[in-house]
Curated annotation (Swiss-Prot):
Keywords, ordered alphabetically: NADP, Oxidoreductase, Porphyrin biosynthesis
Protein name from the UniProt record: Glutamyl-tRNA reductase
Organism this protein belongs to: Geotalea daltonii (strain DSM 22248 / JCM 15807 / FRC-32)
Gene this chain is encoded by: hemA
PANTHER family: GLUTAMYL-TRNA REDUCTASE (PTHR43013:SF1)
EC number(s) recorded for this UniProt protein: 1.2.1.70
Domain of life, source organism: Bacteria
Misc remark: During catalysis, the active site Cys acts as a nucleophile attacking the alpha-carbonyl group of tRNA-bound glutamate with the formation of a thioester intermediate between enzyme and glutamate, and the concomitant release of tRNA(Glu). The thioester intermediate is finally reduced by direct hydride transfer from NADPH, to form the product GSA.
UniProt remark on domains: Possesses an unusual extended V-shaped dimeric structure with each monomer consisting of three distinct domains arranged along a curved 'spinal' alpha-helix. The N-terminal catalytic domain specifically recognizes the glutamate moiety of the substrate. The second domain is the NADPH-binding domain, and the third C-terminal domain is responsible for dimerization.
Length: 434
């Protein structure tokens, strides 16, 4: 069985493309069921964040499986595959494992070392477990990814100087305004990103924080944490003129802020500048808002310049983290190989022993005067011949350094000898790695 990955990220696609194929985090049951209904896709997990959309799956047909996942991603969102495909990447086998381990360890993030991606993958895995689209292989695979991320976090300093996208937004605000002590921040949304942004803005010393959310209780809860003010979502545009910096991160499927809304707001501010940071995918703010005088709009892609300065200081720690990833890849593949190999060896030996016993019984039936000692010797002889015949193929199968060749050997033996292997028991999900 092969692990395959198909996806796109901030490295391969602009936000205008990523938002077209994003999955709603609150509506994962339907796409997950559709995913594992694809022919020859046996398990599947969907990861959808502001910076990436990825599908992890298992299949016996690597090329066909990858092609089907690409088609699924395009068709599910009614997006032309020919437009989407140039932005997609795909991996299988060791490369797929390396990619996911690196993503979970935040080595592939826009901001290397940021902790949010691990939580996002855990949430995605939780949905797959809940809706039963993951099985023994992806369960073990993602638990391994979580443990790799934990090793990276505890054995390197990659996260000690890391900044999140939310912190990068604060740094960008400081570049625009300089001193933020007389600035008021409006957070639209009450999720993790907004909470992180609130912490960073408070630490920077802003004058105040306002929070609005479609669920007012969540806005109140977040505002109370930072001695801020909760605003009813219906009153957003009545209160927006009081904010100098607006950070938006909702799960809305459409623009919630449009040019006509802001034209009235900026007039009430007597054209005092406003700084909008849209880190939602799909985007919350119509890009045409940026055409309005004294309005400055930035998206997640614009944060690249802010975070680039952190790359060099993390380079050494990243190298340590990459070494950990490589160690763990070998361990995981040893397990994955044994998952296919052990039942095949058992079935092969059982098949040979069945034939040996049948032929030995025929011989015994026709050899009426064979003494008991002779029977024992024939039993030992046929056992020895069987073991000699099976020694070489068994030894080759047990080697853990063969990569995808093991799959070829396993499939060949199963087909040549018509082997039936016992199904594996499901791995207990247990607790996710902290």
């Amino acid at each position: 069985m092969n692990i395959i990955v198909v996806g796109l990220s901030h490295k391969t696609a602009a936000v205008e493309i990523r938002e077209k194929v994003a999955f709603s985090p609150t509506q994962m049951e339907k796409p997950l069921h559709a995913l594992v209904s694809i022919p020859d896709i046996t398990e599947g997990v969907i990861v959808s964040t502001c910076n990436r959309v990825e599908i992890y799956a298992t299949t016996r047909d690597i090329a066909g499986g990858i092609a089907r996942l690409k088609r699924f991603l395009a068709d599910y969102h009614n997006f032309p595959l020919e437009t989407l495909e140039p932005h997609l990447y795909s991996y299988h086998g060791e490369a797929a494992t390396r990619h996911v381990f690196r993503v979970a360890s935040s080595l592939d993030s826009m901001v290397v070392g940021e902790p949010q991606i691990l939580g996002q993958i855990k949430t995605s895995y939780g949905y797959a477990a809940e809706y039963k689209s993951s099985g023994i292989i992806l369960n073990r695979f993602l638990h391994k990814a979580f443990s790799v991320a934990k090793r990276v976090r505890t054995e390197t300093k990659i996260a000690s100087s890391a900044v999140s996208v939310a912190f990068a937004a604060v740094e960008l605000a400081k570049k625009i305004f300089g001193d933020l002590s007389d600035k008021t921040v409006m957070l639209i949304g009450a999720g993790e990103m907004c909470e992180l942004a609130a912490k960073h803005f408070i630490n920077t010393g802003v004058r105040g924080v306002m929070v609005t959310n479609r669920t007012f209780e969540r806005a109140v809860k977040l505002a109370e944490e930072f001695d801020g003010k909760a605003v009813n979502y219906e009153d957003l545009f009545d209160q927006l003129h009081k904010a100098d910096i607006i950070l938006s991160s909702t799960g809305a499927p459409h623009f919630i802020i449009k040019p006509k809304d802001i034209e009235d707001v900026i007039r009430r501010r007597k054209l005092k500048p406003m700084f909008f940071i849209d880190i939602a995918v799909p985007r919350d703010i119509d890009p045409k808002v940026n055409d309005i005088e004294n309005i400055y709009l930035y998206t997640v892609d614009d944060l690249n310049g802010v975070v680039a300065t952190n790359l060099e200081q993390r380079k050494k720690e990243s190298e340590k983290a990459e070494a950990i990833v490589e160690q763990e890849i070998g361990q995981f593949f040893k397990w994955l190989s044994s998952l296919e190999v052990t039942p095949t060896i058992v079935a092969l030996r059982s098949k040979f022993d069945e034939i040996r016993r049948a032929e030995l019984a025929k011989t015994m039936a026709n050899w009426k005067d064979l003494p008991p000692e002779g029977e024992k010797r024939l039993e030992a002889l046929t056992n020895a011949i069987m073991n000699k015949l099976l020694h070489q193929p068994t030894s080759v199968l047990k080697r853990s350094d063969q990569g995808n060749r093991n799959d070829l050997y396993v499939d060949a033996l199963r087909n040549l000898f018509d082997l039936e292997t016992a199904p594996h028991e499901e791995m207990e999900l247990g607790e996710l790695e902290e």
